[in-house]
């Protein structure tokens, strides 16, 4: 059967090869923190300063790394694949975008966006977000969108400008990272489910197979008849659900797989199941 419709899921293993820490290390911690202390709504209510500091550090780190060969290969597939394609990432970094991917969906949100809990507005945000972070006036640099700079931001008594200000409603200290935390619903689940049920080929890259609902994507795709491939540094918890498994570094295996898929497409040959 010809492959016309592809869904790809990427996880932390893809960005790890660019130098970003995986979601959980061998000790169960994420950059030295328990997940429940920095990645839940309860943690944010309990200690917003800690949560903001954690994501400010992740955002700063993101600015020091570059897309790797896996990101670049997937962007090439996006550009050259003639059929339907949806790249769903669990990662909150922007490395897929920087590599050039367009048909992309961030199911767990984006580190480079803010979300105002006062008005619901979302916007680009690449600098510090902590309410304790302030810059001398006038505001310069990447922390504000152009709209925020034009509208102005409240100043402290010392004449410095608050960083955590919504560019829409101007609420101070109400902007949180646009990240889906544990206990919150991932984005675009209806669209993802529709794509999984319609795809001919599902490929999971660099995921642990431990975090739902993404861990269940292979079951949906395979039940609906898709050929399923896992590309991972080691077999995931759900590797037995895939038709085939390719073990190794994403930066090596993904470019080879993309060459394979595009080569078969160029010759109008079916990708066998």
Residue ranges and their predicted role:
Residues 1-273:
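Conserved catalytic core of sirtuin-type NAD+-dependent deacylases
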């Amino acid at each position: 059967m010809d492959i016309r419709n592809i869904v790809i899921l990427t996880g932390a293993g893809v960005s790890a090869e660019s130098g970003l820490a995986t979601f959980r290390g061998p000790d169960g911690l994420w950059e030295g923190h328990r997940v429940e202390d920095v990645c839940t709504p309860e943690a944010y209510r309990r200690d917003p300063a800690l949560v903001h500091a954690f994501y400010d550090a992740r955002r700063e780190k993101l600015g020091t790394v570059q897309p790797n060969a896996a990101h670049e290969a997937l962007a090439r597939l996006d550009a050259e694949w003639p059929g339907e394609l949806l790249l769903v990432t669990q990662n909150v970094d922007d490395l897929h975008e920087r590599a050039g991917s367009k048909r992309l969906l961030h199911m767990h949100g984006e580190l480079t966006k803010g979300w105002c809990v006062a008005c619901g507005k979302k916007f680009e945000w690449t600098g510090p977000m902590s309410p304790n972070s302030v810059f001398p006036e006038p505001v310069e640099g990447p922390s504000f969108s152009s709209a925020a700079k034009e509208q102005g931001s409240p100043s402290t008594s010392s004449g410095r400008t608050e960083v955590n200000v919504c560019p829409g409603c101007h609420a101070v200290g109400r902007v949180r990272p646009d990240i889906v935390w544990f206990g919150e619903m991932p984005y675009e689940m209806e669209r993802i489910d529709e794509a999984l049920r319609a795809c001919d080929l599902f490929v999971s890259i660099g995921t642990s197979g431990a975090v739902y609902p993404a861990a269940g994507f292979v079951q949906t795709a395979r039940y609906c008849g898709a050929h399923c491939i896992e590309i991972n540094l080691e077999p995931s918890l759900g590797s037995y659900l895939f038709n085939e498994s390719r073990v190794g570094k994403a930066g090596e295996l993904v470019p080879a797989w993309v060459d394979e898929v595009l080569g078969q497409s160029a010759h109008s040959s079916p990708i066998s199941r």
